[in-house]
Regions:
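Generic beta-strand/beta-sheet core signal
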Residues: 1-3, 29-31, 59-64, 194-196, ...
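Active-site lining segments that contact anionic ligands and/or coordinate catalytic metals
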Residues: 23-25, 54-58, 121, 188-191, ...
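Polyanionic/metal-chelating signatures
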Residues: 6, 11-198, 207
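C-terminal cap of metal-dependent C-N hydrolases
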Residues: 184-191, 196, 208-210, 260-306, ...
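Short loop/turn motifs at secondary-structure junctions and domain boundaries
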Residues: 135-136, 239, 283-286
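Short beta-alpha connecting loops at secondary-structure transitions
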Residues: 29-35, 200, 220, 273-283
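Long, structured ligand/cofactor-binding scaffold of large enzymes
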Residues: 199, 203-219
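C-terminal helical cap
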Residues: 132, 140-148, 153-183, 214-265
Length: 319
């Protein structure tokens, strides 16, 4: 709408003026939204015009959708219902036992129908086992599974969870939901890979796999980017944006962190939920395979999935 367009123009205007006045880069997060699915295109057009004026404005975006994870390992879309909420503090094994209790399960199904969440079930996707896929379509949605089974979305959620002993995960990509939009942004010269969330919402979002997914999907599977270009986009390009000239390059005297990758065997399974925070609190993790070694300042920091004990990192300070 016109009000939205004016808001975007106002934002780009002040960023442009700030960059022109200071000579410094300005960066911001950019993603496609469901409510305004083409607004990102307007932003790209505007920052392109700003770049022609000499402004250094760069958007940061992701290599796939930004999604909330649902599952009985932690939170579900139906937790406003008391019977669902009552499971929150149980172990996964105890939750599965409750789900297999026909009387309790019937109560859960009934309450999920009576108190449905304000969410579109056709936009919640079942993550497959094995190598994870995020490029899912309507046929993979919770609503489609419910229609196929002839049950409500809440009952389908339970059914799909029990197929995997409660470990089934569901992804709700609320930003960057369309891969064509992601590709459009990744191809744009004023867009840098960034914007991942794996800390602030560690029980809801798992974005630490974004670099691996970029290599696995956009490079290896889609062959949309050459491997050399992809490595540059993950390393040198973001380092240059923040004027870290001694990072992101293989050069004598630079503080390079090196990953030795078995590219043919690069794998990315679905996230898992672990309880390794203080007081037994939980978080999502996502372990990839195919990284043989990670070297930090010349020392082997990780060998496979195992930390070697080396602590060779140094605090980064702006020059």
């Amino acid at each position: 709408d016109s009000g939205r367009a004016e808001d975007l123009q106002r934002e780009v205007h002040w960023m442009t003026e700030a960059s022109l006045a200071t000579g410094r880069p300005v960066t911001f997060g950019l993603a496609q939204s469901r409510r305004h699915p083409t607004a990102y295109v307007s932003m790209l057009d505007q920052i392109s015009e700003s770049a022609k004026r000499g402004a250094r404005i760069f958007a940061q975006s992701t290599t796939r959708g930004i999604g909330v994870l649902f599952g009985f390992a932690n939170r579900t879309p139906f937790d406003r219902a008391s019977s669902w909420r009552a499971l929150r503090n149980l172990s996964l094994k105890e939750k599965v036992a409750k789900l297999r209790d026909s009387e309790y399960c019937a109560r859960m199904v009934r309450e999920a129908k009576d108190n449905p969440p304000p969410i579109d079930f056709s936009q919640i996707f079942v993550l497959p086992k094995g190598d994870v896929r995020y490029d899912l379509g309507i046929e993979d949605s919770l609503q489609t599974h419910a229609d196929r089974l002839g049950v409500s979305p809440g009952e389908a959620f339970i059914h799909l969870a029990l197929e995997n002993e409660g470990e089934t995960l569901f992804n709700y990509p609320f930003l960057n939901p369309q891969f064509d939009a992601v590709q459009h942004m990744l191809d744009h010269p004023q867009v840098v890979i960034g914007l991942g969330d794996s800390g602030a919402h560690c029980g809801q979002i798992m974005d630490s796999s974004l670099p691996t997914y970029f290599l696995k999907y956009w490079v290896k599977e889609r062959q949309h980017f050459a491997l050399e270009q992809a490595i540059y986009m993950l390393t040198s390009e973001p380092a240059q944006l923040f004027d870290m000239h001694d990072r992101g390059v293989l050069r004598e005297g630079a503080y390079a962190d090196l990953n030795v990758i078995d590219y043919d065997n690069l794998r990315l399974p679905p996230p898992t939920f672990v309880h390794d925070f203080p007081a037994g609190s939980g978080r999502y993790i996502q372990r990839s395979s195919g990284y043989d070694y990670t070297l930090v300042n010349g020392q082997v920091f990780m060998q496979g999935l195992d930390h070697t004990g080396a602590i060779a990192g140094r605090v980064l300070r702006s020059a």
